[in-house]
């Protein structure tokens, strides 16, 4: 079992055969060693009990019911006075049945088997270490050809040092047929190596430090050579250099983790605990079994057949032995990763078997669904909507979610303030939704941050902390500026909310994970809290105005026609002259009174520097008054001058949307300046 206090992390890697044996082997009180699964059976069809030494054997994996052996005898678990601790008839220990969730078994393979993950997955670690083509290694593993053993001290029967399958292809057919099983074994064990055993021998003979040194020397030699002028040759050199770098990194990893390369070839195959590959009885007496059980059965069947061929039969041709070794290799490949070599294996209903890789990988795999994606207490989930009135570090929680998340804190507050005598009374007050409950809830939420997470959490900003406030409705309100860190938008995205309970988690949430403390991207350092999506659309609508310029009303024939039929009034500015305002407050007031629209053009009095106005710009139109004053109308501003050409005032042509946007920016700049002045 994994103790959460002793084990802080989980690492998946290669293990030695001795470690696999230590995991699965156990010594029962009578001194007998059990752990090897030798029979491909599961349950007896008459007694409906696990078969001995089978895939669900109670001697190997523990009892199905706590304290009850296969014979039906019962002992109290943990009672030292009860002797013996196991059944002398069936050999089953009187222990808790939960042992079947972690007690493993093993299958002793008659021939070595290459782990398909390290052979067929890209990049192929075995091919990288041996510096050989993957196709050649596959032919060797699946017994398509053989090679001569590199024995230097003794003369070989064939007097060969390298591979001979390229020169005489017919040998791989003639030699196995010529020798009988007994003679072929002597010849093969001395002269020929094939199958995964050949790969294991080559991996065992490797010196990782020499591999690193030789690869480094070759890499330097290739780097010293200049371009050849041939594009194809230059690409080959670049690919070779990249391969050498990967090979050196792989060898360093093996040395650093104390892993032997020959462990990539299996001699013992671990058997998963029965509870992780169950057989369930459904209505009608039918049984539903995990696909892994059928794949394990196939491995045991073929392995036992190979054992019989090598031990009992004396006249079996060697070719048949090699074919059976290939079948064992393919059965283990299907168990580990079905379909990695091409067409996947299917059952009688043409359904693809679910291998070990399929069980653990993907969104519905063991890790993401059961270990990483499991539901936890003090958490909730809802759709996110925009909260434009929120501060950057705040989020809005619905009352329904907040009262569930902080229910224990509210109960403690009710009892401390003597508003409830016990937990039951406090829960009844919460169910009745009394006003005092919401007051205490707000007090609790003020001092307790929450964590918001949006899947998939691909980087650090995928989960951030916020100060929660109560909102109406059933959706979580979020400030739009934090959407980029979550890669979220408001088209139906959902987010999970978690409550940090320990003091360490709360301190981390306040000091490191608050949204207003994560304004820069941890990857490249660029600002992460920038307007995106909805905010950009809103700013565009706010500042778009009318696309037609100042001459639209005068030179548009449709507007002229409408102008002639329109009744002129002081409150109608649609096709009459554009209104003038002395300040922004009057313009916004007119908008609130619905006298003008958000994008209606207007003239606003403004303190504009004369140097900003281009002196060479020609006015579009000039309006003269009876007293000699005149208005020079330009594309974006208007100047009121006297008879002596003195400037009385300047108006700019804008909209209410531009005014609102400008005021927000001005207030933000003033607030930032005040904060800087206070800091200094």
From Swiss-Prot:
Catalytic activity: RNA(n) + a ribonucleoside 5'-triphosphate = RNA(n+1) + diphosphate
A Pfam family recorded for this sequence: RNA_pol_Rpb1_2
Cofactor annotation comment: Binds 1 Mg(2+) ion per subunit.
Listed cofactors: Mg(2+); Zn(2+)
GO cellular component: chloroplast; DNA-directed RNA polymerase complex; mitochondrion
Name of the protein this chain belongs to: DNA-directed RNA polymerase subunit beta'
Enzyme Commission identifier(s): 2.7.7.6
Protein family membership: Belongs to the RNA polymerase beta' chain family. RpoC1 subfamily.
Residues binding Zn(2+), per UniProt: 69, 71, 87, 90
Organism: Olimarabidopsis pumila
Stored Gene3D superfamilies: 1.10.40.90, 2.40.40.20, RNA polymerase II, clamp domain, RNA polymerase Rpb1, domain 3
Cross-referenced InterPro entries: DNA-dir_RpoC_beta_prime (IPR045867), RNA_pol_asu (IPR000722), RNA_pol_N (IPR006592), RNA_pol_Rpb1_1 (IPR007080), RNA_pol_Rpb1_3_sf (IPR042102), RNA_pol_Rpb1_clamp_domain (IPR044893), RNApol_RpoC1 (IPR034678)
């Amino acid at each position: 079992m994994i103790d959460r206090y002793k084990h802080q992390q989980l690492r998946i890697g290669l293990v030695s055969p001795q470690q696999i044996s230590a995991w699965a082997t156990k010594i029962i009180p009578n001194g007998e060693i059990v752990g090897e699964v030798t029979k491909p059976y599961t349950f007896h069809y008459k007694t409906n009990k696990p078969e001995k030494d089978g895939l669900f054997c109670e001697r190997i994996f523990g009892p199905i019911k706590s304290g009850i052996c296969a014979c039906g005898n019962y002992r109290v678990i943990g009672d030292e006075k009860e002797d013996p601790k196991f059944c002398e008839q069936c050999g089953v220990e009187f222990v808790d049945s939960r042992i079947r969730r972690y007690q493993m078994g093993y299958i002793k393979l008659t021939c070595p088997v290459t782990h398909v993950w390290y052979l067929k997955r890209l990049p192929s670690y075995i091919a990288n270490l041996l510096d050989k083509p993957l196709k050649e290694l596959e032919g060797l593993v699946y017994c398509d050809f053989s090679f001569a053993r590199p024995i230097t001290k003794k003369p070989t029967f064939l007097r060969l040092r390298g591979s001979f399958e390229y020169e005489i292809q017919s040998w791989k057919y003639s030699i196995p047929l010529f020798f009988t099983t007994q003679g072929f074994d002597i010849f093969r064990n001395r002269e020929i190596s094939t199958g995964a055993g050949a790969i294991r021998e080559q991996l065992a003979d490797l010196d990782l430090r020499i591999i690193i040194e030789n690869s480094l020397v070759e890499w330097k030699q290739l780097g010293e050579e200049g371009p050849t002028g041939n594009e194809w040759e230059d690409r080959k050199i670049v690919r070779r250099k990249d391969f050498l770098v990967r090979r050196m990194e792989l060898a360093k990893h093996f040395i650093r983790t104390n892993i032997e390369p020959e462990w990539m070839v299996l001699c013992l195959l671990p058997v998963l605990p029965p509870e992780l590959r169950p057989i369930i009885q459904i209505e009608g007496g039918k049984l539903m079994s995990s696909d892994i059980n059928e794949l394990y059965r196939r491995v045991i069947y073929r392995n036992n057949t190979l054992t019989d061929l090598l031990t009992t039969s004396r006249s079996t041709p060697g070719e048949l032995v090699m074919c059976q070794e290939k079948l064992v290799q393919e059965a283990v490949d299907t168990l580990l990763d079905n379909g990695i070599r091409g067409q996947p294996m299917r059952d009688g209903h043409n359904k693809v078997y679910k291998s070990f890789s399929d069980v653990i990988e993907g969104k519905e795999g063991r890790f993401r669904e059961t270990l990483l994606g499991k539901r936890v207490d003090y958490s909730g989930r809802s759709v996110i909507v925009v909260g434009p009135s929120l501060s950057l570090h705040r989020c809005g929680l619905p009352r329904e979610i907040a009262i569930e998340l902080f229910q224990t804190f509210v109960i403690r507050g009710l009892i401390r303030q003597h508003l409830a005598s016990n937990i039951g009374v406090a829960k009844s007050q919460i169910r009745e939704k009394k006003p005092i409950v919401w007051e205490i809830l707000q007090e609790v939420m003020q001092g307790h941050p929450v964590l918001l997470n949006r899947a998939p959490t691909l980087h650090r900003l995928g989960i951030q902390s916020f100060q929660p406030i109560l909102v109406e409705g059933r959706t979580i309100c979020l400030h739009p500026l934090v959407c980029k860190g979550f890669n979220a938008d408001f088209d139906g995205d959902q987010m999970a909310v978690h409550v940090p309970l320990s003091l360490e988690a709360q301190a981390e949430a306040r000091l490191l994970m608050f949204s207003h403390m994560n304004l820069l991207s941890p990857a490249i350092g660029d600002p992460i809290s920038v307007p995106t999506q909805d905010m950009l659309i809103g700013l565009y609508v706010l500042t778009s105005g009318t696309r037609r310029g100042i001459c639209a009303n005068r030179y548009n024939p449709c507007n002229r026609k409408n102008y002639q039929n329109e009744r002129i009034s002081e409150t109608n500015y649609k096709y009459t002259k554009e209104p003038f305002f002395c300040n922004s407050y009057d313009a916004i007031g007119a908008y609130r009174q619905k006298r003008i629209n958000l994008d209606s053009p207007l003239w606003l009095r403004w303190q504009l520097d004369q140097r900003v106005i281009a002196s060479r710009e020609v006015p579009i139109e000039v309006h003269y008054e009876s007293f000699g004053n005149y208005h020079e109308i330009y594309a974006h501003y208007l100047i009121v001058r006297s008879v002596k050409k003195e400037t009385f005032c300047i108006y700019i042509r804008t909209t209410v949307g531009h005014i609102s946007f400008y005021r927000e920016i001005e207030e933000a700049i003033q607030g930032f300046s005040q904060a800087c002045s206070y800091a200094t």
